[in-house]
């Protein structure tokens, strides 16, 4: 599970953070501490890049945030068969996957461009970077110490 602040307040996002603050990520190991396979990591990396371009959104200026979220999506893809949002707590992950609401891209992202994980940020978001791409090496480097 990851936790971070967003600049848009909504029922799905925490309160806005003041300008100039850095976004941070806290991570807990997934079920049985399993790591994402390279195949799932690459699938989620490509998906994230394509969706960012298609939705005119950008990755966080702090690339480690992007890397951790993509790794979390890949972990869930391996463990659950679907890219369930890794930034939320679930009592029953399998039921959440079946419902589909929090499968990436989640309903709030598709309907209102509100990404709780800060993976897909609108250009006006204080934490939005300039990039819509990230390499597999960047993801592995950023997540290797977690």
From Swiss-Prot:
Residues where [4Fe-4S] cluster binds: 85, 104, 106, 115
Swiss-Prot/TrEMBL catalytic activity: [thioredoxin]-disulfide + 2 reduced [2Fe-2S]-[ferredoxin] + 2 H(+) = [thioredoxin]-dithiol + 2 oxidized [2Fe-2S]-[ferredoxin]
SUPFAM superfamilies, per database record: Ferredoxin thioredoxin reductase (FTR), catalytic beta chain
One Pfam family cited in the UniProt record for this chain: FeThRed_B
Record's GO cellular component terms: chloroplast
Cofactor comment text: Binds 1 [4Fe-4S] cluster.
Location, primary (coarse class): plastid
Oxidoreductase is among the record's keywords: yes
Subunit organization: Heterodimer of subunit A (variable subunit) and subunit B (catalytic subunit). Heterodimeric FTR forms a complex with ferredoxin and thioredoxin.
Name of the protein this chain belongs to: Ferredoxin-thioredoxin reductase catalytic chain, chloroplastic
Organism of this sequence: Oryza sativa subsp. japonica
